[in-house]
Amino acid sequence: MTYDETPVSGGPGPRRSWSGLIAVLVSLAALVAIGVGVFVGLRSLGITGTQDFEGEGSGSVTVVVEPGDTLSQIGATLADAGVVASADAFVSAAAAEPRSSSIAPGSYAMREGMSGDAAVTLMLDPESRVVKKVAVPEGWRFERTVAAASKGTGLSEESLRESLSRAGSLGLPAYAEGNVEGFLFPATYEFQPDVTSDEVVEAMLTRFDQAAADVDLEARAAERGLTALEVVTIASLLQGESAPEDYDKVARVIYNRLEEGMPLQFDSTVNYALGTSDLQLSKDQLATDSPYNTYRVRGLPPGPINSPGEAALQAALNPAKGTWLYFVATDPANGVTEFATSYEDFLQLKREFQANAG
């Protein structure tokens, strides 16, 4: 019997071919590693051939990174402004810095004659951002928000009010019924130096929409048999009457009084009607003829009395369980609020408040 000595498929021949291929790949990887090492070494010595300045630069120049700009486009912008010697100087420096992908659109305060490394480092520093900040605390009425927005952006109050008059086209929800009070969401905003009044108003309304979506405002309001506007109004009452830790209990008081057909009798609503912020109101003030005066008018006021935050919106949709009908800030200086179910207990709490108020 004879045997065929020709190697079969998968025998030693192909195995030797795979070994050769692996050897080639290993060699290529080694060459790439050597190349990268040489580049990094040359770059550290400043002899890569890329035009680059040395040092931190001097003077001041503002550059703008547009939305969607690539690192190459940012580099070109910097080079055109004289910040870096070439776009490649910035791009190569950015490639060596993983955080460079976080460079966001906006205006940056840079210096002329910077090295690529220095330019990347400065752009990653939040302090280099040229922005106009507007801080709107929770519970502010829209007049204060307009004043703060004017001061922070340099825009006139008149131009901001003109934009507010067109809020329906800038994102004001239809259920707001044209009333901007309560819908300029409290937050800290950052705007570009050339921001317009429309953009300021739109940003605040958009932020409200985000908060409303987060709490599922419209659907959950409907579950309670309320409109979204009524829930925002309740949230503004919580914001104006109590501290965050008491929001849910005050919300329960509101619901209980509405169910009993009792007037809410909230000082915050009278203050809103009068444009004041008094801790104690006179009889004349309490007799103010206004649909916002919840001493005279039963039910909720026509709309929000300030801009509530998300915690107040949540509490308005999630009142605590309880039978309270009254609450009194018995010790405002220390943030103490107490609750009562009977009128007699309420009177006792009121006496405690008067004693603490002096």
Map each language-model feature to its residues:
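Hydrophobic membrane-insertion alpha-helices, especially the h-region
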Residues: 24-39
